[in-house]
Amino acid sequence: MPVSDDSSSAFDLICAEIERQLRGGELLMDAAAASELLLTVRYQLDTQPRPLVIVHGPLFQAVKAARAQVYGRLIQLRHARCEVLDERWQLRPTGQRDVRALLIDVLNVLLAAITAAGVERAYACAERRAMAAAVVAKNYRDALGVELQCNSVCRAAAEAIHALAHRTGATEDADCLPPVDVIHADVTRRMHGEVATDVVAAGELVIAARHLLDPMPRGELSYGPLHEGGNAARKSVYRRLVQLWQARRAVTDGDVDLRDARTLLTDLDSILREMRTAATIQQSGTAGDGGGGRRQDSRRRNGPRRPARRGTSRGRRCAPRVAIGWHTPIGDPLAVEGVEEIGASLPGRESTPSDDGGSLHPSGRPRRVHRRRWCGLGLC
């Protein structure tokens, strides 16, 4: 699930909109708009977690085992969130009370998805960085370095499982190099003559960059009232990104001819720089069109907005958050501070605590947690 850290991302916009609706004494969103919001979260935002790149390099077995644990748990949690939204959708809200209950469930699911996406993003970055560093270590015949990266993958997987099981957010180390910088740093050293190199070592770096650093650009799904316009706007950009990706793949093809190492490193240096630019463009495009349709639809249904309060960041298309936001500890992946537990008002949802301390009971549904409220949302 590609979730942007930008404050104007789709996740952030919808969280702010739901919070604004729940904070007021009277909901401005009608049943139809609330149901459409539920569908946006269900089918557009909370997508199936999956790895971006294939497993490559000397850490093949370690990464395969780690992925089975981490992504197995992520998929299980996502299935539980989908169950909540599907059951809520079947109830067909009518009055204000039903709409409020729907928004509470959607907000809980959305914040749980943000937590899971943060854990997935932290693990994926650590995994790719370790695989890239292991390739570099193998080129230097550094068996200890490869073993250290293997331990790094196991540790990242254990931290991800711990974060999901104990309902804590991911802790990303800002000082660690991104995966592309690991390869690029070694390429720079070799180009400057700091390290002796040959065609085989340069070729290993080229193949590692192909498999670990350059996934195919994704065509993100458009949903809502801007569906056609969103697809038309991104079509030319996405087509160009794919063309550039295909050109890079042609250079980094596995059947690359055995040219001199200097030429291979020069080509790889240019490719790595282009990878950074393409990734930035795609991320900006994904975050930029994340919430426009929802905001436009809300104005169309509910009329003009009330004047913004002093101190709000209307220029960033983001309502102010008091207690719920990116930096708020979310706690239980399926329940957040100040908001009632997911599915609390759904009929037939029994509370059965799980044996392993996780957020699911044996039937696979979210477990009930202690009811917590936040007066700032008007839920007291």
From Swiss-Prot:
Region: Disordered, residue numbers: 278-323, 345-368
GO CC terms of this entry: plasma membrane
Ranges annotated as biased composition (Basic residues): 301-319
Domain of life where this protein originates: Bacteria
Record's protein name: Uncharacterized protein Rv2084
